[in-house]
Amino acid sequence: MTFELAAEHEQFRRTVRDFAEKEVAPHAAQWDRDHYFPVEVVARMGELGLFGLTAPEEYGGAGLSGEDGGFTSLCLAIEELGRIDQSIGITLEAAVGLGINPILTFGTEEQKQQWLPDLVAGRTLAGFGLTEPGAGSDAGATKTRAELSNDEWVINGSKQFITNSGSSLTSVVAVTARTGAVTDSQGNERAEISALLVPAGTPGFTAEKAYDKLGWHASDTHPLSFEDVHVPAASLLG
């Protein structure tokens, strides 16, 4: 077993390192001071194909083959960006791991066609709304609720610390919510937790003022609120 990177991975690492040192490093300190989310750098990352490393070609991704399906390249990109500015590293990590991959893994073909091409190209970003005040990231403790009424889900609740959820690039947030109850194999009833795709700009969906965090000031992180937010029944993810 060898732990050395393949030649193509080393080449890719050098490409991302060069980008980070030339286009991120000169501005990182100022972005952090200004609490500025650099949408222009996200666009450049999209041009480099960084958001599509694990996505199939049919949605605009790299379609990388092999055992890792592009995840080694993704990890190298996150590492090199984070070496210069962790805000930019987490932007990529969350955009793919929390934004693209849930839709790619669990979405219907219609959902994939609607959202993935722009997400994979870096033209837009998606968030994943799990964490809540008082519940943390414990999905089973989710308090946000969604009720199905006349072929629409009506969502009420709040989320906190949601990355890539409130910039001009945000197109959609997958929101976890209680959608009913299920009975487990032991006969015990528990909450049914589902994820719903909520487009940015949907009435009642508000990305509140970005957090003044201890660090990562150039990462886009917001509390979210949902007040009688209506989305189609087909917005259910998975």
Question: What residue ranges belong to the model's regions?
Answer:
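Short Ser/Thr-interspersed hydrophobic loop/turn segments at strand-loop and sheet-helix junctions
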Residues: 49, 78-82, 177, 198-203, ...
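Glycine-rich phosphate/pyrophosphate-binding beta-alpha loops
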Residues: 83, 135-137, 160-167, 216
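A short core secondary-structure module
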Residues: 156-206
